Structure formats: C-alpha cells, structure tokens
C-alpha cells in the first residue's frame, strides 16, 4: 500500500512540471523520481531483516563483557556473576558439570593464594637486601626462615639428582642403603646451605697451640685438645654479652661444628687464654677486668670426656675471691649482715677500707707462707716484691709482702689503692705538681695490671680511688679515676718488669739470685736491694 501511494504521486508531479516547463525538463524529473523510488525500497527491507530477537541480547546489552555464572550456563541460562553468587538458582547443584566446576574453582583459589604468598616473601627478602646489603640480607632472611624461592626446575633437578642412587640402588645392601640415604639427605642440605662448612674451615685461622711452659689452671685441669662436641664453651675468652645473640645464627652453628677440633683449655677453672682468636682479648690474657674473669669462671663450662660440670660459686666464694686478704669468717659475717647480697657486702668492705684509709690506718695483710714460696712462679710477681718476699718475714710492710694465696690470674682489686705509701705522697704533693713520681710508685704495687708480654707495653695501672689518682699526679682527673675509668701508665723502666708469659716457670730462688738492676737518682729514684727507698 505504501508503494502504491508513492508511485501515483510521481506522475502527477511530473505532469505538473511538464506543463509548466516543457518537454526537456519533464524527462529529467521522471528519471530522478524513478531513482529515488528504487533507492528507498532496499533500505526498508534490510532494516526489518537485521533485527535480532530481544531475549538473546538482553544480558549482553545490560552487562557487556562481564563474567557470567558457570552454573547457570550449564543449565542454559545466561546471568551476570556480579552479586549473583548468593542468589544463584543452582548454587547447591550436585550434577557432574557443577561438581567439575567446583573442583576447578578450588584449584584456582589455591594457586592464587600460593602466588600471593611467594610474592610477599620475595618482597620481604628484597627489602632485607636493600637494608643490610646482599650477603647480610640473605643471612638474616635465612635466620628468619624467609628464603627466596628458587626456580622450580633447579629445585626439582637437585632433588632428582640426589635421589638418583637412593632407595632403588641402596635398599638391597643392608647398611649400604642407610649410608646412601644419609649421603643423599646431606647433599640436599648442602644444596641449600648459605654458609658451606668447607669455606668456614678453610677461611678460619688456626688457633694458637698451647705452650709447654703454661701452668695448670687453678683447679688442676690439664690443657689439651678439646672434645669433638659442637658446643662452644660459654665461659671462654672475653665474652661481653654477645655470645647469646651470636650463637643463634647459622654462621655460629657452623663455626661450632668447625671449632670442635681446635685445642682449648678445658675444665672449670681454665681461663680463656688458649681459645680461638675470635674470643681472645685484644690486650692479651691479662687485660680483662676482675669482674669479667669471675663471671667467666662462674658460667658453666663442659669438662673433658663428659665429666661433671663445675659447681656454681656461692656468694661467700665470690667474696673470698674478690678479697683474698680477709678471713673467711669475717666475710661470712659481713654477708650475713647484708642479707646474702654480694654487691652490698662488697660495698660494705670497700667503705670500711676507705674509712681506715681516711683515719691513716692501712689494712695489714697477713703473710701467707704458701704464697711466699710460690711467688716466683706467680704471674703478678714484681721484682721488688719478689726479692722482699724471698727474704720473707711477717715484719715486712704491707706493700712489700707477698700477696695471699690466690690463683695467678686473680689479683686483689684494691690493693694498690689502699697502700699506705699512697697516703704519704698524697699529703706532700700538690694537684698541679709536675708528673715526677717518687720511688714509692716503683715498689710492689698489686694494683698494677701488667699487659701481655708479647705487646711489650708498660703495665696498665687502674686508678681505683682518689688517693691513687692524687699520688700519681692525676688530681685533675679525679671524677674519672674514682670510677676506675682512666688507665694510667707507670714510670718504671721497661727492663724492670717481670715478663709474665716468658718467665712464668722461674722459682723463688732463681728470682732471688737474679737481682734486678738498680737505677741511681734521676726519674726512677734510688733502688736498694730491689726495694724502693723512701724519699
């Protein structure tokens, strides 16, 4: 009907144009009208044929390129997945297709979680490398259990190579199978070891061999090669509290195993002189403070051959070691008065001695005949005291007497500070006088700590009190010298010292025969029979 209405109108328009314009214009108008009619016919037909059914395109128009529900798709329904999981019609369906979909979703979720965890560990390891450097960051990551994952082919290749001669080849032979299994497990551990033991053993300097002239330890334990136990003795050397933090690292564990065959002085009282260089003090075996030595001896140390461990020191034993010149009964009474507190008891004894010094009454040390006989072999035997003690006698003044019986590595703490000779020089010397000490400083001073003979240095005199500091002309450092923080060097000639490590085995008679050289006048003052003359 549409076409019929459009076709008759065209001739009417053409006749009207023909009557108005004439014959040539009429022919052109008829051709244009026919072309317009022919062009309008295919467009109207194509629009009707290309229309899609509305049901199929409804989800695509509403949710373009969005994920669809797989369960609904299995049952012939297309539904967008966003906000649909809870309200899905087939969420509890147990058909074969839905069960397969559920298993696939579970596997995908596990893979995503694994990738996320690996990415997090890699980020943490990378941060540690940036913070502490490459090698230290890897060591810290390994100590914390964070090891960067290796490529999958490398891990499986090493495991397969280690298992190549494993159960199949080693099972028929009775003991051969166990050895092969142990070898394969050791190869696996060596593959992932950050600190190979061969490098540690090759790069570790050998520890010094024990010298034949070394005496026995105070408790009589022999100095010999250590056992093959991987444990490191806690009380060895000059440990300053960092042993516990170092022992947890993998480097410490490997060094424990590598250091099992190194010689070391074992036993309860064998100090740390023959230990490895890592634990040796830089100033030699004599430079550690008395408190460190006591602490090192009090710490438990395994003996040779699985023997019984050393007993823990009681507070009374600690007091007798700190104050060897006092009677045990007196120290026990002081300890009971302080309620068993060792620190308070030490303070009480020190305060008592300071009060005695202020009153001008220096404490007299009772002579010990055993110490007089063994003073030549002692480590802290000074020349003046050796000669005076060899002559022997209870009438000697306190600074010239031999020290009481004590192990050679443990000296009285405050003997030098409490010497009566220090008081005389204190009263007769100004704080601003030049540093020219009198002859009393060259006598027997038990507070003078000799440095190790291999260093060839003067003895280290620790100023424990203001009196000792004033007597050495160091009054301007009084607030530091009272705390024992300022080491001062003595003015005795270098040839006048006893070489502790080289002349340890000389006897008292040999020490008396070989008189020390005397120095007349000058800086060192006159020496009479090896004893200083009072100025």
From Swiss-Prot:
Gene Ontology CC: nucleus
Top-level taxon of the source organism: Eukaryota
InterPro entries: DM_DNA-bd, DM_DNA-bd_sf, DMA, DMRT, DMRT5_1_DMB_dom, UBA-like_sf
Region named Disordered: 200-315
Keywords tagged on the record: DNA-binding, Metal-binding, Nucleus, Zinc
Chief place of localization: nucleus
Gene Ontology terms: biological process: regulation of transcription by RNA polymerase II; sex differentiation
A molecular-function term among this protein's GO annotations: RNA polymerase II cis-regulatory region sequence-specific DNA binding
Biological role: May be involved in sexual development.
Protein name: Doublesex- and mab-3-related transcription factor A2
Native species: Bos taurus (Bovine)
């Amino acid at each position: 009907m549409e076409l019929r209405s459009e076709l008759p109108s065209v001739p009417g328009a053409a006749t009207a144009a023909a009557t108005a314009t004439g014959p040539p214009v009429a022919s052109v108008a008829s051709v244009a009208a026919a072309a317009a009619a022919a062009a309008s016919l295919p467009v109207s037909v194509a629009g009707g044929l290309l229309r899609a059914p509305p049901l199929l395109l409804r989800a695509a128009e509403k949710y373009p390129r969005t994920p669809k529900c797989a369960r609904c798709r299995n049952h012939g329904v297309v539904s967008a997945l966003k906000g649909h999981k809870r309200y899905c019609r087939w969420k509890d369906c147990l058909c074969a297709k839905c069960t397969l979909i559920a298993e696939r979703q579970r596997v995908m979720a596990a893979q995503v979680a694994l990738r996320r965890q690996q990415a997090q560990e890699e980020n943490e390891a990378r941060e540690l490398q940036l913070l502490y450097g490459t090698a230290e960051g890897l060591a810290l990551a390994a100590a914390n259990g964070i090891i960067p994952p290796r490529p999958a082919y490398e891990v499986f290749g090493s495991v397969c190579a280690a298992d190549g001669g494993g159960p199949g080849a080693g099972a028929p032979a009775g003991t051969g199978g166990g050895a092969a299994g142990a070898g394969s497990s050791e190869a696996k551990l060596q593959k992932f070891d950050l600190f190979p033991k061969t490098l540690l053993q090759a790069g570790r300097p050998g520890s010094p061999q024990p010298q034949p002239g070394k005496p026995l330890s105070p408790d009589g334990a022999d100095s010999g090669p250590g056992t093959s136990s991987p444990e490191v003795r806690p009380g060895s050397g000059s440990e300053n509290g960092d042993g516990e933090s170092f022992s947890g690292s993998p480097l410490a564990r490997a060094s424990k195993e590598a250091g099992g065959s190194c010689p070391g002085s074992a036993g309860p009282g064998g100090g740390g002189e023959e230990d490895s260089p890592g634990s040796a003090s830089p100033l030699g075996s004599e430079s550690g403070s008395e408190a460190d030595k006591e602490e090192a001896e009090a710490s438990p140390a395994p003996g040779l051959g699985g023997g019984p461990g050393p007993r823990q020191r009681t507070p009374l034993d600690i007091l007798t070691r700190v104050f060897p010149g006092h009677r045990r009964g007196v120290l026990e009474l002081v300890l009971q008065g302080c309620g068993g507190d060792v620190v308070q008891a030490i303070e009480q004894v020190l305060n008592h001695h300071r009060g005695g010094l202020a009153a001008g009454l220096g404490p007299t040390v009772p002579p010990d005949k055993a110490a007089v006989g063994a003073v030549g072999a002692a480590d802290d035997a000074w020349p003046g005291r050796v000669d005076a003690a060899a002559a022997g006698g209870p009438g000697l003044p306190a600074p010239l007497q031999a020290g009481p019986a004590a192990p050679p590595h443990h000296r009285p703490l405050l003997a030098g500070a409490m010497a009566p000779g220090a008081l005389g020089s204190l009263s007769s010397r100004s704080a601003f006088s030049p540093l020219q000490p009198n002859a009393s400083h060259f006598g027997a001073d038990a507070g003078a700590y000799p440095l190790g003979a291999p260093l060839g240095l003067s003895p280290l005199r620790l100023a424990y009190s203001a009196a000792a500091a004033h007597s050495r002309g160091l009054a301007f450092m009084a607030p530091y010298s009272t705390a024992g923080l300022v080491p001062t060097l003595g003015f005795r000639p270098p040839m006048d010292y006893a070489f502790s490590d080289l002349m340890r085995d000389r006897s008292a008679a040999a020490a008396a025969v070989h008189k020390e050289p005397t120095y007349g006048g000058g800086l060192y003052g006159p020496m009479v029979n090896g004893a200083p003359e009072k100025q």
